[in-house]
């Protein structure tokens, strides 16, 4: 998951029917992201009403095509991040920083790693950056991957 708010749709059988994607339920971030919340809300309502027959519920083949394989770097990043969190919770914040940095290096697109680390210390001092600076570095690249929803379904 890139950042909050994201969601994974899981049906009553425990099966994932949509992978993680940005999940705005209102338009408070529309000027920042350019994403309208209405199509996503309509999709949720359609799925809630129609279940597996909803055009928004993905088949197993569609789901597999969208899921990204887990790389060795991502697995190592998860381990580094977990170690950093552990050290921080043990009162060893300074010892955690190199592990937070390594997690970010190994999985540079993971904003969860960045934002968590920056919130636990002085981001400018310890990481030489801030959330605002990193967003500016995107230089127009979407912060959130655009949703892949089918064309709007006519309302009854």
What is each model feature region?
Residues 3-92, 121:
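Thiol-/selenol-based redox modules, centered on thioredoxin-like
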Residues 31, 108-116, 128:
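Boundary/linker segments of alpha-helical solenoid repeat arrays
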Residues 74, 106-108:
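Short coil turns that delineate tetratricopeptide repeat
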Residues 120-149:
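Alpha-helical linker/edge segments of TPR/alpha-solenoid repeat scaffolds
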Residues 122, 153-156:
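Long, low-complexity intrinsically disordered regions enriched in Ser/Thr, Asp/Glu, Pro/Gly
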């Amino acid at each position: 998951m890139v950042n909050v708010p994201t969601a994974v749709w899981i049906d009553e059988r425990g099966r994932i029917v949509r992978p993680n994607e940005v999940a705005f339920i209102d338009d408070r971030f529309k000027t920042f992201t350019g994403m309208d919340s209405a199509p996503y809300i309509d999709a949720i309502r359609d799925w809630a009403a129609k279940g597996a027959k909803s055009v928004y519920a993905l088949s197993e083949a569609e789901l597999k095509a969208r899921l990204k394989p887990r790389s060795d770097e991502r697995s190592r990043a998860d381990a580094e991040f977990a170690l950093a969190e552990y050290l921080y919770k043990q009162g060893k914040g300074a010892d955690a920083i190199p592990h937070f940095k390594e997690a970010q290096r190994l999985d540079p697109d993971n904003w969860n790693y960045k934002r968590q680390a920056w919130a636990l210390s002085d981001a400018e001092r310890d990481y030489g950056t801030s959330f605002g600076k990193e967003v500016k570095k995107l230089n127009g690249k979407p912060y959130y991957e655009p949703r892949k929803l089918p064309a709007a379904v006519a309302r009854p």
